[in-house]
Amino acid sequence: MDKAEAHKILTEQLARFTDHAQLVPLVESQHIENCEVFGASGTRYQVEVQFFWDDAPMRAIRVVASIDDGGVRAFIPLTETLFVSPHEHTTA
């Protein structure tokens, strides 16, 4: 798996989830977003995004995205986390 390409895809996917008000229903319903994305190299990646309260309900939301190419990385996917507060967001 091309880590740079996978990281770019994760960054693009996380950018879709920065509005706290829109994320609240996803956390409350325990929604998991799954999709397949093709990288510039033609590699097919599986992306999973999960949503959690970070510390307490109605406060910061932790958005966790993971990616793999179906190979060995499927057992240990590349993962990135975004924290979205009601007023701002940060990436870890």
Show where each model-derived region lies:
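Flexible, low-complexity segments enriched in proline/glycine/serine and punctuated by aromatic residues
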Residues: M1-A92
